[in-house]
Structures are given as structure tokens and as C-alpha cells.
Amino acid sequence: MTEDRAHKVADEPAASGRQSPERKKRKWDQPAEDLVSAAVTAAAVSGMPVMNFGALPGVVLPGVTAYGAATLPSVVPVPYSLPPHIAPSVLQNAAAAAQKLSQAKIPDEVIAREIVINDADPSVRYKLTKRQTQEEIQKCTNTVIITRGKYHPPNLLPDGEKPLYLHISAGSQLKDTAERIKAVDRAASMIEEILKQGTTSESISVPFSSSTGQAVRPFSASVFLGFDADPSLNITARIRGPNDQYINHIMKETGVTVVLRGKDSENLGSCHSEASQQPLHLYLTSMHLKNLEAAKVLAENLLDTVAAEFGASRISSSKVYGAVPPPQQLLAGVDTSGTKSDVHYIVGPNVLSGATHSFASTGVIAPVVAPAVTVQSGAPTYSGVPLPSNMAYPIPPANGGAFYSGYGDIYPQATPLQQLAFTLKHASSSATQAVPVTSTPTSMATKGNSILDAEMDKRSRRKFQELPVSKGPATESQNSQQGSKFVKTGLDSSGNIGSSSIAPPKKVHPGSNGMLPQEEADMPSHLSISTKMLPPPLKSMLPLPPRSMPPPPPKSMPPPPPKFPSDEFLSRNENKFFPLKEPTAPPRSFDAISVLPSERRPREPKEEKNKRHTCV
């Protein structure tokens, strides 16, 4: 009976094992490695001596045969004490244990570091929390920097939350533990260096290293307070705002670093520097010029508001500019030696009255020259552009208003209404100052004046004006009335100039019929001075005549007869502008006598009439 029961008990576990499914193997089912064997293998790798574990009772090492205490000394070096058939297995176990120890991963929180920046200077705190600064440090050290915590002002009670700090951890690309620790330490040292430099005056001007390795200096600007305030008013706190909100607002809006510097600024960094001797101001720095300009506007508004609160008048830093120098191209031809010319540009009616000008035998005239013209190396220049030496054109002013000597008498400094009043005032005045004289050949000057007078006469004449027909020989007055076609040559006119005085200029007003008045017709057209603005010199001017010219014709020689358009030309113009007039027939009347012969009906023969009567 006992044997049967024993068979049943032995069969029950086998049956239960068949029925229950096999469980999956997990890593927790594997037995842990013996601590003693691990220590032995580690010691073997490091070369440390191993004790005689065979003499210890109850301690059995896997793969190691126990030897007596008499055969082994107390301390035996491993490479020389192990038998040849045991050494390979021990070395393999030691290598595996060393690999496991090297692969053991230390938690990131053990390597990571935290640097509190809550109590740092506002500019440094903003710089460290800026993403651009953090990315620069991350690229250099292969770390990850995160801003955490909450900013706690100095006068605010703690609320249980961590103050503002930077969390530094190693990057995922670093596998070795030693490299991860070194990277975190390097990033922490860079942040601590920035915190230390923030207490000095050079904290803001630390250059960033660009991708090319070159140092890039940021742009900077200073916005001064503009007035002296009483130290007892604590104006620094008004500029900073509660908890530095005003300065932080400018930094957040524009991304520019803002630092309050100068006297009574309470800035520890500027206590022993040159900035402490300057007036109170906001020092702005940025890597982008556009952001710096935007920050300057906000800083100006902030200081204007503070000045209004204290009732002080403030001069804006952006408005304190000196006189803007003129462009370099204008300085080339303008004489700015300090003497300012007051010559009026509007020529009055008595400019040359009563003055007799004698000319040399070469024959020259005296044109009007603007005071802005400076003669350099024998040639007049205006705004750096030399004029042709053979021209005698007067240079008109840039405008009719007053001129400012700081710009070399070029830029008008008056409104259009003031310029108009200035022009009318000096147009009616009769006294003007003398005008400089330049000498040019007579023929070219008279040709230029005759062309200008001809253009003015063409503007004043009507389109279909008829020229008067002179019965007698043409006089000099007729030549001046008939435009540029009848102007005398320059040689003829030069002879008259040398023996007569120049008459005062008069304004030309055409009469009702479009012709010049009789009293103005006595003066030749080439001696008339026009008060209107003259056009620029013509480029297509004829060359100078040769010196070997024939003598001028005698004065008694009559001028050439006037050239009138032919009948064919007049008829062509009439057909062009006027419709052709067809002859109209006289009015008809019902009387038979007034009917034209061509319109009368032909008479019928008498025979046809008789036939008609017979038929009826």
C-alpha cells in the first residue's frame, strides 16, 4: 500500500506540470552574480593580489579548486599564482565584469547642474535667458541649457517656488560618462564667467564668436537723461520702474540689452569706471542695428515721461545734432572760406545806368555771374562742374530765397512764401551791388544772346502775326523787332559797343499787336539784358571763328532786305488752317428774268406742240 501511494504522489507533480503552460523567462528569473566572484575578477583585471580563499571554510568559487593552506601563501599575485587551466576562465570573467561596469549608466540628474541667476544684474539675467546666448553655449559645450524657476524680486516674499535658474545637462550625443561630466562643467564655467563679467563695465561689450571664428562686436548707443535731478528724488527708481519693469519691457520688446549707467545709477559695475563720471543715461547694446534703433525710441519715450513727471525740460539725445555738412561733391566747387556774398540775383532797372564801360581792343562784354561761382585755375565752376571757357552765360540761383552760409550758399533756408516775398521786395528795389566780370569772345557772346532773344520773341509773338512791310531802307530798330533773322553779325555789333555806352536794361512788354514798343525798339537786341532765368549752355555751339577774319563791313552799309514768305508758302498755310472757299451762286428768285441761261428748260419745237393739241 505504501508503494502505491508513493507512485501516486510521484505522478501528481508530473501531471500538474503537463497541464500548466510553461511561463516566459524574465530577466528577474536569472540568478544574480556572486559578489565574491565579481570582486575576484575585478581584482584580477586591476592586478591586485588575491587572498587564499581555498583555506576559508564554506567558501567555494566557481571553477576554482580549493587548495590547502600549506600549499598557498597568504597573498599570491594572480598572474603567477593561478594554474594554467584556470587563468583563461578567470580572465574572461574579469573582462565581462569590466564591460558591465563601464556600460553602467549614471542618471542625468547626478551629472546635471543648476546655476541660480535670480539675483544677477538685469542685463546679465536677460542675456543668460536669451535663446541666442544659450544656443551659443550649447554649440560650444555639447550640452542642453533650460531656463527654469520663477523670478523673485528682492523685496518680495518667497512663495515656495524655486528662484530663476539655469538647468545644464549633457547632450545625448555624448556616451561616455567622463565626457558628459566634462561638458556640463565647461558650460557651467562659461555661465559663471558671464555672471562675473556682468559686475564690470565690460560685461556688455564681450564679443560673440561667430561661426567663422571671428569676434563680432555688438552695436551700442547711449540715451542720456537730459537734465540734472536732485539725488533725494530717487530718479533711478523712476527710470527702472517697479521691479525693473520699465527696463525689462524695452529688452523684451526689442531684444536689446539695457543698462542704467552714470551718476547715482546704483550700478555696482560702474562705480570705479569712466561711466560713473558721465551723466545718468541708458546704455543700449544689440547685435542688430534695427533693434537698437527701436530700443532708442522706447528709451527716449521713457525718459520723456520721467522728465514730465518731475516737471523738467529735457533735450532729446536724438535731436542734439550739429549742422549737417554738405555733400562732398558740392564742396568741390563751392568756396567756403568764411566770406558770404550778399549780391542780389535780381537785376534792377538801374544796374548799369550812368556807367560807361570801356572795353579793350579784343572786344569783350560783361555778363552776369552768380556769386556761388568760384574761379579756379582760370575757369569758373559751379557745384564742382566746370563751365566752358568760351561761354558767357549767367548762372541763375538755385532759388529766390535766402541762403545759409553753412551750406556754401547752396541750400535755401526759407519757405516758398518767404522766397516769394523776398523776390518781390528785391524786384522793386533799384539799388544793387556790383557784379563780377569775366571776359569771353564777343562773337560767341552775341550769338548766344541773339539766340536767347530770338526764343523769347518767338514766345511773345502770335501764331499768325504778319510782319510790317517797310517802304524805305530797313533801320536798326526793325532788325531788333524782326527776331533772330535780322540780327547783325557779332563783328558789326562789336564796333558799336566800343564807341557807345550800354543803356540800362528794361523789361520787354509786347503791345496789343504783339510787337515791341517804339521806345524799346531803339536798343539793339544783342544789347538787351533779360531778367528771366536763362537756359543752360548749349552743347551744339559753333566753334570760335578764326583770327584771320575779313574786316567788318562799313557802318553805312544798309542791312539786307527783309525776307518775306513767298505767295506759294502763304497760300499753302492758308489752305492748311482755313477751309477752301468755294464761289457761292447768287440767290435765286422766282422771276424768269433772274434765272440763269444754264438753268432754263429747253423749248419744245412747235410741231410737237401742234401734235399735242390735235391729240387732245
Swiss-Prot record:
Sorted keywords for this record are:
Nucleus, RNA-binding
Skewed-composition ranges (Basic and acidic residues)? 1-11, 565-575, 598-610
Disordered: where is this region?
1-32, 432-455, 467-616
Q: Which InterPro entries match?
A: KH_1_KHDC4/BBP-like (IPR055256), KH_dom_type_1_sf (IPR036612), PRP5/DDX46/KHDC4_KH (IPR056149), RIK/BLOM7 (IPR031121)
Top-level division of the source organism's lineage: Eukaryota
Mind telling me what this protein is named? Answer: Protein RIK
Compositionally biased residues, Pro residues: 534-564
List all Polar residues biased stretches.
432-449, 475-484, 491-502
| Subunit text | Interacts with RS2.
Localization, UniProt: Nucleus
Cite the Pfam families for this sequence: KH-I_KHDC4-BBP, KH_12
Any GO CC annotation of this UniProt entry: nucleus
Gene Ontology molecular function terms on file: RNA binding
Work out whether the entry's keyword set contains RNA-binding: yes
Q: In which tissues is it expressed?
A: Expressed in vegetative tissues. More abundant in apices and young leaf primordia than in fully expanded leaf tissues.
* Database matches in PANTHER family: BLOM7, KH HOMOLOGY DOMAIN-CONTAINING PROTEIN 4
